[in-house]
């Protein structure tokens, strides 16, 4: 706003927790989604700055807005400035290596962002004519993912797993691999999760080289956090802030972007809180009536265009393990693949602990992947499934009671299970073994050799934590 006379100023008329009613002059009502700012002193004389977003027009020149900051200390009668536009956040290379809040303000104590460009967080999804409709697989360099539950370029993947099974390390490896193999960048949205987890992720990213402290612009990721101690408005909008940064890398820099949301359930949960505060009638299980619309508006912006792609990996919390709960059920409708992490595999020391039988992908079709890849994946799954069925018999009677054919299946399945493990680049500092990126062709070649029985004479330990099959052969030779 250039001069004071053109400013549109209203006054707070009612405060209900994080929801504010604001009265404006006749004919000066701000638009829905406009950002409003309140700069004032509270009763203790301390400076306050609160940003809120218009959600409803109440009539009589009154609007109802949801605050993005805590509203403690606000009073009726305080002046509210209409910025005349939606929330704008910084975008571009200068966001890499930094941590932002929902308003696009850096919160990592590294000073302001030197930035030329900013974009509004509310944007329309790309038009259909701009979309890239080709079905192509997004190679991650992680054997178990690429072979058995491949990601779609520009697709959406659900990441399921409890605490301590390796979600964070898998996320960091994906960030590292997209930067090295695809020249892409990543944006991480921490939506309504613990502050401690956000801090741990940031620290681990610095240790593993995903964030380069000496020269932040060489970092591979931008972080946007709206933690669970923040108002529901911030948690509801933080995913859009991060998505806006990701869209810039896709549309302007024409890059492949990995977009992480941890956790998509908290996005829905925040929307439910805001919906109730705005006085909307709740729908099933107390969720907002606009649940599918809100989820659709976010998910439709995550897509591939002819310029670049946003491939999204979303951690999904399932309340009370009920997959029919409206929040996870609505999320599933948008997912192209699921990566399920297994505590059983993690306890065996097989990392990444991706469950090869529970993880799924819509890309696992012969007409998309080709017969060679599809046939190999199906044979691996068949072998592992048979091993799973035989485990009870082995536990009771032992291996010797199995038929010759079944013993061969078990031996190959154990080799496959170990060959699905892989040393990660980001874990080098902890494990001491160098990370490996395995191309899809090498992955298929390796598993086909195991399935064909070419490597039946090798010890199964030779397949544990190696990259391609040649490394397994080298390891076996060194073990003799």
UniProtKB/Swiss-Prot annotation:
Membrane topology: Peripheral membrane protein
InterPro entries: AAA+_ATPase, ATP-synt_VA_C, ATP_synth_F1_bsu, ATPase_a/bsu_AS, ATPase_alpha/beta_chains, ATPase_F1/V1/A1_a/bsu_N, ATPase_F1/V1/A1_a/bsu_N_sf, ATPase_F1/V1/A1_a/bsu_nucl-bd
Classification via Gene3D superfamilies: 2.40.10.170, Bovine Mitochondrial F1-atpase, Atp Synthase Beta Chain, Chain D, domain 3 (1.10.1140.10), P-loop containing nucleotide triphosphate hydrolases (3.40.50.300)
GO biological process: proton motive force-driven mitochondrial ATP synthesis
Enzyme class: translocase
GO CC terms: chloroplast thylakoid membrane; mitochondrion; proton-transporting ATP synthase complex
A molecular-function term among this protein's GO annotations: ATP binding
Enzyme Commission (EC) number: 7.1.2.2
Reactions catalysed according to its record: ATP + H2O + 4 H(+)(in) = ADP + phosphate + 5 H(+)(out)
The keyword Transcription belongs to this UniProt entry's keyword annotation: no
Function as written in the Swiss-Prot or TrEMBL entry: Produces ATP from ADP in the presence of a proton gradient across the membrane. The catalytic sites are hosted primarily by the beta subunits.
HAMAP family: ATP_synth_beta_bact
NCBIfam families, alphabetized: atpD
Protein name (record): ATP synthase subunit beta, chloroplastic
Source species of the chain: Tetradesmus obliquus
Upper lineage: Eukaryota, Viridiplantae, Chlorophyta, core chlorophytes, Chlorophyceae
């Amino acid at each position: 706003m250039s001069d004071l006379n053109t400013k549109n100023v209203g006054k707070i008329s009612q405060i209900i927790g994080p929801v504010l009613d604001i009265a404006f002059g006749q004919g000066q009502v701000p638009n829905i989604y406009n950002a409003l700012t309140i700069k004032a002193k509270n009763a203790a004389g301390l400076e306050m700055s609160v940003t809120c977003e218009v959600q409803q027009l109440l009539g009589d020149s009154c609007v109802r807005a949801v605050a993005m900051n805590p509203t403690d200390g606000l009073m009726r009668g305080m002046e509210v400035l209409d910025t005349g536009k939606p929330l704008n956040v910084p975008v571009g290379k200068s966001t890499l290596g930094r941590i932002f809040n929902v308003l696009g303000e850096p919160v990592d104590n590294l000073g302001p962002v030197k930035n030329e460009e900013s974009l509004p967080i509310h944007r329309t999804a790309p038009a259909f004519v701009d979309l890239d409709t080709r079905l192509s697989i997004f190679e991650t360099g992680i054997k178990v993912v690429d072979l058995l539950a491949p990601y779609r370029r520009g697709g959406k993947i659900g990441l399921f797993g409890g605490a301590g099974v390796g979600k964070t390390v898998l996320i960091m490896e994906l960030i590292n691999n997209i930067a090295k193999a695809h020249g892409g960048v990543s944006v991480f949205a921490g939506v309504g999760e613990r502050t401690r987890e956000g801090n741990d992720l940031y620290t681990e990213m610095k240790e593993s080289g995903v964030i380069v402290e000496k020269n932040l612009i060489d970092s591979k990721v931008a972080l946007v956090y709206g933690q669970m101690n923040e108002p529901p408005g911030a948690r509801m909008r933080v995913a859009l802030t991060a998505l806006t940064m990701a869209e810039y890398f896709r549309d302007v820099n024409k890059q492949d972007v990995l977009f992480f949301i941890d956790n998509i359930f908290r996005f829905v949960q925040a929307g439910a809180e805001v919906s109730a505060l705005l006085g909307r009638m709740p729908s099933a299980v107390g969720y907002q009536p606009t649940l599918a619309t809100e989820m659709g508006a976010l998910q439709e912006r995550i897509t591939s265009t002819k310029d670049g792609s946003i491939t999204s990996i979303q951690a999904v919390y399932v309340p009370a393990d009920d997959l029919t709960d409206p929040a996870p059920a609505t999320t599933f409708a948008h997912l192209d693949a699921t990566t399920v992490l297994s505590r059983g595999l993690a306890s065996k020391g097989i990392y990444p602990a991706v469950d090869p039988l529970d993880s799924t992908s819509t890309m696992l079709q012969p007409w998309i992947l080709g017969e060679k890849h599809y046939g190999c994946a199906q044979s691996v799954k068949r072998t592992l499934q048979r091993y799973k069925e035989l485990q009870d018999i082995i536990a009771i009677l032992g291996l010797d009671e199995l038929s010759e054919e079944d013993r061969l299946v078990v031996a190959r399945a154990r080799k496959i299970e170990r060959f699905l493990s892989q040393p990660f680049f980001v874990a080098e500092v902890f494990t001491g073994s160098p990370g490996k990126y395995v191309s899809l062709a090498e992955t298929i070649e390796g598993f086909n050799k195991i399935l064909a029985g070419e490597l039946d004479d090798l010890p199964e330990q030779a397949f544990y934590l190696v990259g391609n099959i040649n490394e397994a052969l080298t390891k076996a030779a060194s073990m003799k």
